[in-house]
């Protein structure tokens, strides 16, 4: 993990933080509907880290939707009016309407 100036945040010199970040990873199957959104220009949570997490979760049998957004970063992905806003509202409304989530792992690019 890196900070905005490029220095690593979770380094061996910050072992307590690195250990806590590793512990703070969901590794059990989640029975509720799951969607993960990732800005492809994100430098706070790099897309490669989310890709690896999604791949690991899918290999473990987790059902989820993984949405990636070109040109969006950690902050612009959630700005009012960003594409995620309407997509997430529609996705959530569908879940409350008891419409099933897509089966397996589905990756959509926006």
Regions found by a protein language model. Give the residues of each.
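Solvent-exposed, flexible loop/coil residues
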Residues: 25, 34, 79
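Short alpha-helix in the alpha/beta-hydrolase fold that links the catalytic acid
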Residues: 32-34, 46-56
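Accessory cap/linker subdomain of secreted extracellular hydrolases
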Residues: 1-27
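A structural signal for short secondary-structure junctions
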Residues: 27-30, 59-61
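C-terminal catalytic histidine-bearing segment of alpha/beta-hydrolase fold enzymes
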Residues: 18-19, 51-110
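Acidic catalytic loop of the alpha/beta-hydrolase fold
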Residues: 40-45, 75
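Solvent-exposed, acidic/flexible segments
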Residues: 10-14, 27, 43, 47, ...
């Amino acid at each position: 993990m890196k900070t905005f100036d490029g220095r690593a945040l979770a380094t061996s010199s910050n072992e307590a933080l690195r250990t806590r970040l590793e512990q703070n990873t969901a590794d059990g199957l989640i029975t509720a509907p799951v969607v993960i959104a990732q800005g492809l220009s994100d430098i706070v949570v790099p897309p490669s880290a989310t890709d690896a997490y999604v791949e690991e979760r899918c290999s473990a049998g987790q059902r989820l939707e993984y949405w990636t957004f070109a040109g969006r970063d950690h902050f612009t992905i959630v700005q009012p009016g960003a594409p995620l806003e309407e997509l997430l509202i529609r996705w959530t409304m569908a879940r409350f309407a008891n419409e099933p989530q897509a089966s397996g792992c589905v990756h959509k690019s926006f």
